[in-house]
């Protein structure tokens, strides 16, 4: 009798806000691509680091792929709420973490939410909401978007062991479309709808990064 294959390791999706977790749960379609755990970390880099480190310390999530997602501030002129950002790397003052499967994510996201622009480049981490002139400074340093948790999430995941990592964010405000309060303006609603639609792309990324290297 042949031995059944071992179950695929799960995908850990980390987000900061309850509204982000709600969007992901509403968007779940089926179980293809392996099991998924959605972790709400809380806001800010310190909360993300604590929450992810605690999750990865347990045996149930040992060796899992980690994907950071949620909303972000777009830094490049011409970005709009609902645009997507696929990080080539995440960075903060402690260093940078390269992301895996960027091209595949771009392809799958374009299929999941046709008509929404997908931007690629460095995603920078901050410890506060960025506005006005600070956006320009971060853009001049090479980043295309900013958020408070992705860099801390991926750095913590990388330090916990070798694993695939990625970050995908939905632009909720941009230089020409600054957001006052998430969920109260059109930009926030648009970003929520996009986030609700992209879990299938994450599952496909996960399925592919689990394939043996050639």
For every predicted segment, state its role:
Residues 2-115:
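Metabolite-binding pocket within alpha/beta catalytic cores that recognizes anionic/polar moieties
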Residues 40, 68, 86, 122-125, ...:
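Structural signal for conserved beta-strand scaffold positions within catalytic alpha/beta enzyme cores
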């Amino acid at each position: 009798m042949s031995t059944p294959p071992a179950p695929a390791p799960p995908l850990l999706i980390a987000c900061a806000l309850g509204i982000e977790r709600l969007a992901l749960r509403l968007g779940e379609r089926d179980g293809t691509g392996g099991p998924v755990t959605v972790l709400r970390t809380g806001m800010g880099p310190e909360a993300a680091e604590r929450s992810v480190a605690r999750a990865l310390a347990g045996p149930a999530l040992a060796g899992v792929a980690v994907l950071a997602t949620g909303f972000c501030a777009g830094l490049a002129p011409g970005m709009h709420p609902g645009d997507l950002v696929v990080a080539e790397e995440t960075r903060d003052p402690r260093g940078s973490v390269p992301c895996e499967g960027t091209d595949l994510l771009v392809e799958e996201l374009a299929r999941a939410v046709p008509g929404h622009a997908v931007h690629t480049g460095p995603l920078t981490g901050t410890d506060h909401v960025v506005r006005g002139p600070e956006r320009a400074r971060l853009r001049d340093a090479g980043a295309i978007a900013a958020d408070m948790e992705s860099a801390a999430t991926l750095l913590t995941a990388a330090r916990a062991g070798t694993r695939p990592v990625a970050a995908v964010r939905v632009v909720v405000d941009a230089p020409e479309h600054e957001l006052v309060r998430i969920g109260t303006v059109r930009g926030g609603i648009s970003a929520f709808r996009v986030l609700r639609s992209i879990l299938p792309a994450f599952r496909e990324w996960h399925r592919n990064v689990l394939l043996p290297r050639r």
